[in-house]
A protein has these predicted regions:
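C-terminal auxiliary extensions adjacent to catalytic cores
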Residues: 125-178
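Active-site-proximal substrate-binding core of FAD-dependent oxidoreductases
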Residues: 82-138, 149
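FAD-binding beta-loop-beta segment adjacent to the flavin cofactor pocket
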Residues: 36-58, 63-64
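Tryptophan-centric aromatic hotspots in well-structured domains and transmembrane helices
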Residues: 1, 43, 55, 69, ...
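Conserved FAD/dinucleotide-binding core of flavoprotein oxidoreductases
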Residues: 1-39, 71-74, 92-93
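Conserved active-site and cofactor/substrate-binding residues in soluble primary-metabolism enzymes
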Residues: 56, 75-78, 98
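Long, K/E/R/D-enriched contiguous segments that form extended
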Residues: 61, 68, 92-95
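A conserved FAD-binding loop/helix module that cradles the flavin
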Residues: 65-84
Length: 178
């Protein structure tokens, strides 16, 4: 507890609206950074995951998305599985090129769907009913994808992003919720 580090004038959240949190934070001291609390704009980024035929990035290296729905672990593990399948293919150039293209297509479509769902949830966060509806769309896709795996299917996309009807429904629902 260093006394030379100034307490921030304001924290990222207005704890005055939450008396129990304000009470908990009343005795808190800043540990880092010494300059105080900082804020920034969106930290999201997206790049194509294929650098070369045998140089692929995991989804979590190619995309940074807000952790609202905790998608990172699932996306990373699916990426490991997909990349291993690509590496296990024989050295056939055509077969590998097709698999790499499928990897990139799946990744980009999943990322687009996730961005739509997460951004919609944030836009309507102040309206609990709309926020709940936005989150339900994400979980409907996640659960359906898990069910497909349990049924022995091997979806090419996570979050049901390979189901055109679901993706179209998601777009329409997000548009209506916004």
């Amino acid at each position: 507890n260093r006394s030379d580090i100034p307490k921030p004038q304001s924290l990222p959240h207005d704890f005055h609206d939450y008396p129990s949190l304000a009470e908990l934070m009343a005795t808190a001291s800043l540990t880092a950074p010494p300059e105080g609390v900082r804020s920034t704009g969106r930290l999201q980024r997206l790049v194509a995951p294929s650098l070369r035929q045998r140089h692929l990035m995991l989804p979590t290296a190619a995309m940074t998305l807000d952790p609202l729905h905790s998608t990172g672990i699932a996306h990373a593990l699916a990426g490991v599985d997909r990349i291993l399948n690509i590496l296990m293919l024989t050295q056939s150039g055509t077969e590998q090129r097709q698999a790499v293209q499928q990897y990139e297509t799946s990744f980009l479509q999943e990322s687009k769907l996730l961005d739509e769902l997460v951004s919609t949830a944030y836009l309507v966060m102040n309206d609990f009913e709309r926020f709940t509806a936005a989150c339900m769309i994400y979980f409907a896709g996640a659960i359906r994808c898990e069910e497909r795996y349990q049924q022995g299917q091997n979806p090419t996309h996570l979050w049901n992003a390979d189901d055109r009807e679901f993706v179209q429904f998601s777009k329409q629902a997000c548009f209506a919720l916004r």
